[in-house]
Each structure stands twice: as structure tokens, then as C-alpha cells.
Amino acid sequence: MRLVIAQCTVDYVGRLTAHLPSARRLLLFKADGSVSVHADDRAYKPLNWMSPPCWVTEQDTETGVALWVVENKTGEQLRITVEDIEHDSHHELGVDPGLVKDGVEAHLQALLAEHVELLGAGYTLVRREYPTPIGPVDLLCRDELGRSVAVEIKRRGEIDGVEQLTRYLELLNRDSLLAPVAGVFAAQQIKPQARTLATDRGIRCVTLDYDQMRGMDSDEYRLF
């Protein structure tokens, strides 16, 4: 991973155009090929980013200022004009073991993948653990109309789970082969604050009855 703190301007050129005026920012160049631009706020969210695969070229402008061009396979570009570099370092992090789900969450995922129709009539499973540059989506499905649906599964549904699914949706909806991608937040229990946030973001909530999904008697299975 390469970490750069620099005074820079950033322009996105592609399906849309976006401009970030000159400011000190953190630039992340990851080993997977992704590049992201961060400010000292917005928590985990980058100001702009480019998903892998993408390629970086460094050029000199007529004014002598460095121009870093990040381009993906579709020709979209992040054009980073670097005015001054405060820090530039490389770090080898190695292979991350990834997030290990607890036993109940892992079993919920397996059961829901097997009985994906519990999410709605006509739902089909595309893949478990669908890979993205920021981690795997628990389930990627298609609804009765063939539209993509990303499903995040938790034992207890809290705000951080909704935020996690939001990050996946932001990334997946940039893929023209998948977009538009809807979201489903599925858990045994969903806290009111998490449900409110999910609803506000257009994410559907599903309450799962673990006992029923294992084949035990229960009258508590509900879809919301």
C-alpha cells in the first residue's frame, strides 16, 4: 500500500464530472489496484475513488506540477494534480485473513442462501460471499424481475451493519453490469435506529427466525 499526503486538486472525468479544489488530502494506492482520495472527515468514506483494475501514470504539466492520472478499463479517470507532497511511503501489509463471522451468522448465511426465496417470491442466488474491493457481500441475488440485490446478514442488526451494506451498494452500483443494485439488511434482531437508517437509505429490512430456518417450530418469522 502506498500512502501519500499531498496538497492536490482532483478531477473525475467519466460518465459525470466532479472537481475537488486544492486541499491537503490522503491518497491511498492499494495493492489490489484501487485508488482513493480522503479528507480528515467523512469517517471511512473517500471523497472519490477508482475501483480496480486501474492504472496510474505520472506526468509533468507545463507549469512543472505533477499530474497523476488514474484510469480504469472503461476509460474513466481520476486526474490528481499534485502541488506539494508532505508524506509518501510504501507498506507491505500481506494477505488479510478477513472478517470471521460468528457461528450463528455463518449458519444464517448458509441457510438463507439455500432458501433465498425467504427474501421474496422469485428470488434467486447469484453467489455467496460476492467479492468486492472492500470485502465480500454476504449474498448477491436477483429478484423476481432479474434486478441485482445485495444482502448483508447479521445476528444483531445495528447501525454499523447498515453502514457496511451502504458501502457495498455504493461500490456495486458503479458496476454497469450489476446496476441498479438494491439492498436487503437481514438479521435476527434489528435495532430501531438501524431500521430507521436503512429505510431512509432505501434498504429493505428482513427479520430472520433462526429456529424456523433450521426447521424448528416457530410462528415469529416476519418480513418487513
From Swiss-Prot:
EC code(s) of this entry: 3.1.-.-
NCBIfam families, per the entry: PRK03298.1
Taxonomic source organism: Mycolicibacterium smegmatis (strain ATCC 700084 / mc(2)155) (Mycobacterium smegmatis)
Pfam name, any one: NucS_C
Name this polypeptide is given: Endonuclease NucS
One of the record's GO cellular component terms: cytoplasm
Function: Cleaves both 3' and 5' ssDNA extremities of branched DNA structures.
Main localisation: cytoplasm
